[in-house]
A protein has these predicted regions:
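N-terminal Rossmann NAD(P)H-binding glycine-rich loop of SDR-like oxidoreductase domains
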Residues: 3-25
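Non-catalytic, hydrophobic alpha-helical segments
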Residues: 12, 70, 151, 182-186, ...
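Conserved Rossmann-fold NAD(P)-dependent oxidoreductase catalytic core, especially the SDR/UDP-sugar
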Residues: 26-28, 34, 80, 84-86, ...
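NAD(P)H-binding glycine-rich loop region in Rossmannoid oxidoreductase-like domains
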Residues: 31-95, 99-102, 190-194
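Substrate-positioning beta->alpha
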Residues: 93, 172-187, 198
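Glycine/proline-rich active-site loop of Rossmann-fold NAD(P)-dependent oxidoreductases
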Residues: 120, 160-165, 189-198
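Flexible, glycine-rich beta-alpha linker
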Residues: 149-170
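Short-chain dehydrogenase/reductase
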Residues: 199-207
Length: 217
C-alpha cells in the first residue's frame, strides 16, 4: 500500500506527514515547490512535485501511477480571490479525481469543508466561492468511478489534538477540531480498507476515532 498526500505542506497535511512517518507508513508527500521537495527529502521523507493548478490531467496521471491511495488535502481557503479558489479547490480537485481514475487509484480521500451542501452557499463574504468550489468537487467525486471517502472537519484549530472526536453525516451545530486530530482521522481512514464511498463531518468529542467512525466502515 503506497499513499500520496497532496497538500503535504499545509496545516493538516504537514501533521499527517509527521504521523505517517512516525508509524512507518509507506507514503509520499506531494508539494507544489521544488524547494519543498528538497526540504522533505532532507528529512528522509519521500516527496514529489504536485501542482494541482498547473499540472495537466496527463501529468497527474503519470505521477499517480505508482500509488494505491491518494489524499487531497489542498485548499486555497477563504482568504484568496475567487479565481484562485476555483483553480485549486474545484478544477485542481477534479483534475486529481480524473487522474486517479486513469491511474487506477484504489482509494481517494478528500478533505472538504465542514458543509458543502447547496444549503451552505449562503456563507457570507469570501467563503462563498470556497463553499461552491467544494460542493462541486465533492459532487464530482461522488459520481466518479473511485472508491472515495470525504471528510468534513469543523473549524480548524492549532491546539494540540486529543485523539477524541465525534462524527455524523450532518451535525445540527458548528464547532471546532484541532488540525492534529483531523490528520489522525485521515491516517486512520487511509490506512484502512474500510470507509468505502462514505462521508462524514468530524468535530472534537469524547469518543476514540475508531469508535466514532464505526458507523461508516
Amino acid at each position: 500500500m503506497s499513499i500520496l498526500v497532496i497538500g503535504a505542506n499545509g496545516g493538516i497535511g504537514s501533521k499527517l506527514v509527521d504521523q505517517l512517518k512516525e508509524d512507518n507508513v509507506d507514503f509520499t508527500a506531494g508539494v507544489r515547490k521544488d524547494e519543498q521537495v528538497s526540504e522533505l527529502e532532507n528529512n528522509d521523507i519521500k516527496a514529489l512535485n504536485i501542482d494541482v493548478e498547473n499540472d495537466s490531467i496527463e501529468d497527474l496521471t503519470n505521477k499517480f501511477q505508482s500509488f494505491d491511495k491518494v489524499i487531497f488535502s489542498v485548499g486555497s481557503g477563504g482568504s484568496t480571490g475567487a479565481d484562485k479558489t476555483f483553480y485549486v479547490d474545484l478544477d485542481g480537485a477534479v483534475k486529481t479525481i480524473k487522474a486517479s481514475e486513469k491511474a487506477g487509484i484504489k482509494h481517494y480521500v478528500m478533505v472538504s469543508t465542514y458543509d458543502s451542501r447547496r444549503e451552505a452557499f449562503d456563507a457570507s463574504g469570501d467563503l462563498k466561492p470556497y463553499t461552491i468550489a467544494k460542493h462541486y468537487a465533492d459532487d464530482y467525486l461522488r459520481h466518479s468511478d473511485l472508491n472515495y471517502t470525504i471528510v468534513h472537519p469543523g473549524g480548524l484549530k492549532d491546539d494540540a489534538g486529543t485523539g477524541k472526536i465525534k462524527a455524523d453525516l450532518y451535525f445540527d451545530s458548528y464547532s471546532t477540531i484541532p488540525r492534529e486530530d483531523v490528520a489522525r482521522v485521515l491516517k486512520y481512514v487511509v490506512t484502512s480498507d474500510k470507509f468505502s464511498n462514505q462521508e462524514f463531518q468530524i468535530l472534537s468529542g469524547e469518543s476514540t476515532i475508531e469508535d466514532a467512525l464505526k458507523a461508516y466502515e
